[in-house]
Swiss-Prot record:
Example of a GO MF term: 4 iron, 4 sulfur cluster binding
Entry-linked InterPro entries: AcnA_IRP_Swivel (IPR044137), Acnase/IPM_dHydase_lsu_aba_1/3 (IPR015931), Acoase/IPM_deHydtase_lsu_aba (IPR001030), Aconitase/3IPM_dehydase_swvl (IPR015928), Aconitase/IRP2 (IPR006249), Aconitase_4Fe-4S_BS (IPR018136), Aconitase_4Fe-4S_dom (IPR036008), AconitaseA/IPMdHydase_ssu_swvl (IPR000573)
Native organism: Cucumis melo var. conomon (Oriental pickling melon)
The protein, known as: Aconitate hydratase
Record localization: Cytoplasm
Lineage: Eukaryota, Viridiplantae, Streptophyta, Embryophyta, Tracheophyta
Length: 764
């Protein structure tokens, strides 16, 4: 975001339309070219919240034929709809495009993990504390590729918004979906959000008749699940997660000790390796004429943001914290970048009705708009003086956000420590100005009367929050907000677009280009490809994220993408995010360009480089890949567990394909990324259980041969495949084409090529 004032929403929406006119025009053209395509106008809110409160049907009624609602979406947090009792999950953009063209979705029948909830949350514990606890438990249990179904008497204690928060975080705990069956709480929510009474009655009758409705006030039959896990809600305690992964939960009472351990620990998910003598460093700087200081752990970004933590209880809870803080005379340091980004306009309405928005404004949390910002790295620059103090003194600065992901380099390039927290805790940490604090024994600040103010002085009780929620969140707010979806807004309605069913590509555009995947495509499938004497382009450890592979968020001023745009006359103020700019297509060297990436070929060095094995030269990943391609050499990637964790970003598969990567050999893959690799024709292989590159003695300096039959009919999903190296080592891997149709995609060179050939054949 750019503007942060009382009229920030309008100012930022105008900027959004100005910068995204070409993109919005393309989408609006699509909505007129295709009869069954609805485009929700920009500024309406984040898609998952719109799904939950407006688009979700729960039960479809098509000319009197009733059947359950379902959804797939190109964002991994599509799972939020599972909180409403609608089966839904995220898929890669490639797979979604194929589905839009009529290709059925295929999957291996998943195991179902039963998650039993009992008891009740303690006073002052938030839905965010619960979801971070659930995320840690399920990551430890292991649920990748599985469904999780929540049940138990504790369900009656959770609001629909609480359930949606847990469902939203399914990608962070690794499940395909986290499902909450429909009950009376679901029906009450449908009424709250403005659904018609007759529709709600139809939903209840259909689900009761089909034994798909649950009444938690009655005794429940214990169902049989693939595996089982249980949580007593009274055991959940206030917590945050970080500094580098969503499932690294830290109880609030242990945060100060955990922070100091992270400073000491070697570089890793829980370590920064700051020498003892450097841990007390104070960076002096000048902030717009006033002296200022930064220390390790100081907060420079505090953001109430994302689609995850948008429930009325946590949003109004944050506002109550702000109210108490303002009344006691507390302030946020002026160099902390504060962000309040809403998932939808209803939040704006109930914050205004409650009279609490003014206190958030007073602390710098003005509403800046509706959409994805800090959570994906789109919060804008921090002040230049703060940035210089961080880089000049090697300060481990912190961001605290109510988002769902905190992977390295994602939130901001200069915040090495990133913590996920509830919206009320975001406000508390902004007031404290540091994560290096024990909230139980140390004051957050000094009030206007000179008295020390503690965390307990500003934290609202559950009863206080409930009173504000019940009196300020009303059905009419939802009806008024979603009326705008059908009516649009003035700027969207005035946007002119070309007519016709074929889009006219503009070759001079830096934004939208014709994709290169069908260039020179013949009607005959190319057939399966093996890998011959391939070099290892990159050798990774565990938890390589799609942010490591392919950037998202803002385009940094010194990046190759920025250089490309500047050379084409694009003003820096008009740079947009990687995710929507054509630099993704033209600048293949933005892939694997994350400054925090660790490539084992570099023997401990951190950064986006690799070794060109034949020459032993250290090059950028792009330059090394292009040299291999020019020499006619195949390349592969070695990786550890959870390869491709994070966003469902299809560019994390498109980019490696364009770089010439033929296969990825990993301990395990995150579900959506594996699917995306298949969709782009890259072979996913898994080491056998108990094995990895290190245990097999692989350094990445070998050459790898993977023999596959030239006839796809001779390949089976999940079969063993031999991998042979030029050093004489050989080992067996599991071929992670999971279904017969995925083998067909591989035979055709990718899913879109398969679908297009089939469409052409069907026309003839």
């Amino acid at each position: 975001h750019e503007a942060k004032t009382e009229n920030a929403v309008q100012a930022n929406m105008e900027l959004e339309f100005k910068r995204n006119r070409e993109r919005f025009g393309f989408l609006k053209w699509g909505s007129s070219a295709f009869h069954n395509m609805l485009v929700v106008p920009p500024g309406s809110g984040i898609v998952h919240q719109v799904n939950l409160e407006y688009l979700g049907r729960v039960v479809f009624n098509t000319n009197g034929l009733l059947y359950p609602d379902s959804v797939v979406g190109t964002d991994s947090h599509t799972t939020m709809i599972d909180g409403l009792g609608v089966a839904g999950w995220g898929v890669g953009g490639i797979e979604a495009e194929a589905a839009m063209l009529g290709q059925p979705m295929s999957m291996v029948l998943p195991g179902v993990v039963g998650f039993k909830l009992v008891g009740k949350l303690r006073n002052g514990v938030t839905a965010t504390d619960l979801v971070l606890t659930v995320t840690q438990m399920l990551r430890k249990h292991g649920v990748v590729g599985k469904f999780v179904e929540f049940y138990g008497e504790g369900m009656g204690e959770l609001s629909l918004a609480d359930r949606a928060t847990i469902a939203n975080m399914s990608p962070e705990y690794g499940a395909t979906m986290g499902f909450f069956p429909v009950d009376h709480v679901t029906l009450q929510y449908l009424k709250l959000t403005g659904r018609k009474d007759e529709t709600i009655s139809m939903i209840e009758s259909y689900l009761l008749a089909n034994k798909m409705f649950v009444d938690y006030s009655e005794p429940q039959v214990e169902r049989v699940y693939s595996s089982h896990i249980e949580l007593n809600l009274s055991d959940v305690e206030p917590c945050i997660s970080g500094p580098k992964r969503p499932h690294d939960r830290v109880p609030l009472k242990e945060m100060k000790a955990d922070w100091h351990a992270c400073l000491d620990n070697r570089v890793g998910f829980k370590g920064f390796a700051i020498p003892k003598e450097a841990q007390v460093k104070v960076a002096e700087f000048n902030f717009h004429g006033s002296p200022a200081q930064l220390r390790h752990g100081d907060v420079v970004i505090a953001a109430i943001t994302s689609c995850t933590n948008t429930s009325s209880s946590v949003m109004l809870g944050a506002a109550l914290v702000a109210k108490k803080a303002c009344e006691l005379g507390l302030e946020v340091k002026p160099w902390i970048k504060t962000v309040l980004l809403q998932a939808l306009g209803v939040v704006t309405k109930y914050l205004a009705k409650s009279g609490l928005q003014k206190y958030l404004n007073q602390l710098g949390f003005n509403i800046v708009g509706y959409g994805c910002t800090t959570c994906i790295g789109n919060s804008g620059d921090i002040d230049e003086s703060v940035a210089s103090a961080i880089t000049g003194n090697d300060i481990v600065a912190a961001a605290v956000l109510s988002g769902n992901r905190n992977f390295e380099g994602r939130v901001h390039p200069l915040t090495r420590a990133n913590y996920l927290a509830s919206p009320p805790l975001v406000v508390a940490y902004a007031l404290a100005g540091t994560v290096d604090i024990d909230f139980e024994s140390e004051p957050i600040g000094v009030g206007k009367d000179g008295k020390k103010v503690f965390f307990r002085d500003i934290w609202p009780t559950s009863e206080e929050v409930a009173v504000v929620v019940n009196s300020n969140v009303l059905p009419d707010m939802f009806r008024a907000t979603y009326q705008a979806i059908t009516e649009g807004n003035a700027t969207w309605n005035l946007l002119s677009v070309p007519e016709g069913t074929l889009y006219s590509w503009d070759p001079t555009s830096t934004y939208i280009h014709e994709p290169p995947y069908f260039k020179d495509m013949s009607m005959s499938p190319p057939g399966p490809h093996g890998v011959k004497n391939a070099y290892c382009l990159l050798n990774f450890g565990d938890s390589i994220t799609t942010d490591h592979i392919s950037p998202a968020g803002s385009i940094h001023k010194d990046s190759p993408a920025a250089k490309y745009l500047l050379e084409r006359g694009v003003d820096r103020r008009d740079f947009n995010s990687y995710g929507v700019a054509v630099v993704m297509m033209r600048l293949w060297h933005v892939h694997f360009a994350n400054i925090r990436i660790v490539n084992k070929l570099l023997k401990g060095e951190v950064g986006p480089k690799t070794i060109h094995i034949p020459s032993r030269e250290k090059l950028s990943v792009f330059d090394a890949a292009m040299r291999y391609k020019s020499e006619g050499q195949d390349t592969i990637i070695l990786a550890g567990a959870e390869y491709g964790i994070g966003s469902s970003r299809d560019w994390a598969a498109k980019g490696p394909m364009l770089l010439g990567v033929k296969a990825v050999i990993a301990k395990s893959f995150e579900r959506i990324h594996r699917s995306n690799l298949v969709g782009m024709g890259i072979i996913p292989l898994c080491f056998k259980a108990g094995e990895d590159a290190d245990s097999l003695g692989l350094t990445g300096h070998e050459r790898f041969t993977i023999d596959l039959p030239s006839n796809v009919g001779e390949i089976r999903p999940g079969q063993d495949v031999a991998v042979v190296t030029d050093t004489g080592k050989s080992f067996s891997c599991i071929l992670r084409f999971d279904t017969e149709v995925e083998l067909a995609y591989f035979d055709h060179g990718g899913i879109l090529q398969y679908v297009i050939r089939n469409l052409i054949h069907s026309k003839h």
